[in-house]
Amino acid sequence: MRLSDFDYDLPKELIAQKPVEPRDASRLMVVHRASGAIEHRCFRDLPEYLRPGDGLVINETRVMPARLLGSREQTGGAMEVLLLKRLDRDRWETLVKPGKKARPGERIVFGDGLLVGTVVGPTDYGGRVIDFHYEGVFENLLERLGQMPLPPYIHEQLEEPERYQTVYAREWGSAAAPTAGLHFTAELLDRLAARGVEIHRITLHVGLGTFRPVEVEDPTQHKMHSEFYHVSPEAAAGINAVRKGGGRLVAVGTTSVRTLETVADEDGTVRPGEGWTDIFIYPGYRFKAVDALVTNFHLPKSTLLMLVSALAGHDLIMRAYREAVAQRYRFFSFGDAMLIL
């Protein structure tokens, strides 16, 4: 397995810059693993492919406005801080621009002093650890001062920040959206429930490491980022009941896949709990819990493309991607969706 095995040609104009309206009007490519057949549908047709007793597992993380624009306390020079991972109550792993100015002890002021950050030191990946000082509730300050951190390949301003949140987002803490969930509307979720599909909620807070490129030709040598997950006892019990009843577990997004496969025993039993996962799923991996997947179209040479290749098979996925390009599907975070059965 080589990194180049996961490359494909993508015209830039197919990288979606804005989401479609309504959410479930996006296209849906249905990939059948057993037959290799590929269908072209609309996302609102999803209920036709799910059966009573199936379980849909959604990630209810909420994207935080993690981009902070501030200035150096000493000189007034502009600084940008991107929150990546909460290490302690007021200590964060961040990315800082310009990084050369972010030396230990440097103080960065945001919102006329409502929030002040002190650089503690560097991280392993070129970022900075920052301690924040403030009065009140940090989350409230961030909602007031922060901006939504859109992926680097989206160049247009987002008119409605809520369009980069799923309709079921609850648990504050992600630096990027679990984008497969962006296609769901409340009405579509109601239709699925009326069909007898069970909906189970888990949480994985998405870090910007999800956009970190693989830089080694042997992907197995890639160091995965770690992300925080939480699976409640209620969710675990419901998910296990789906499997015992003969239903399929349909993960919404690669984040749900990584969470389920982290907490599943060898026999597929899902255990409740929380912690950090750096699971890396690539071809050859044996899935323990996940039977099907709703996902978006991923970047060339990315760990997410490797994950979907592990589930559907490398050759079938690459054929599906070539067909998606030929059929002018929209790619990446605001793009169209794929259902792998």
Curated annotation (Swiss-Prot):
InterPro entries registered for this protein in UniProt = QueA (IPR003699), QueA_dom1 (IPR042118), QueA_dom2 (IPR042119), QueA_sf (IPR036100)
Source organism, top-level taxon = Bacteria
Pfam families xref list: Queuosine_synth
Gene Ontology biological process terms, A to Z: queuosine biosynthetic process; tRNA wobble guanine modification
User: E.C. number, please?
Assistant: 2.4.99.17
Question: Gene3D superfamilies in the record, alphabetically?
Answer: QueA-like
Q: Where in the cell is it found?
A: Cytoplasm
Q: Name one GO molecular function term.
A: S-adenosylmethionine:tRNA ribosyltransferase-isomerase activity
Q: Which UniProt keywords apply?
A: Cytoplasm, Queuosine biosynthesis, S-adenosyl-L-methionine, Transferase
Catalytic activity as recorded in UniProt: 7-aminomethyl-7-carbaguanosine(34) in tRNA + S-adenosyl-L-methionine = epoxyqueuosine(34) in tRNA + adenine + L-methionine + 2 H(+)
- Keyword Lyase carried by entry: no
A GO CC annotation recorded here is: cytoplasm
Involved pathway(s): tRNA modification; tRNA-queuosine biosynthesis
According to its UniProt entry, the function of this protein is described as: Transfers and isomerizes the ribose moiety from AdoMet to the 7-aminomethyl group of 7-deazaguanine (preQ1-tRNA) to give epoxyqueuosine (oQ-tRNA).
Its quaternary organisation is:
Monomer.
Q: Which family does it belong to?
A: Belongs to the QueA family.
Annotated protein name in UniProt: S-adenosylmethionine:tRNA ribosyltransferase-isomerase
Q: Which gene encodes it?
A: queA
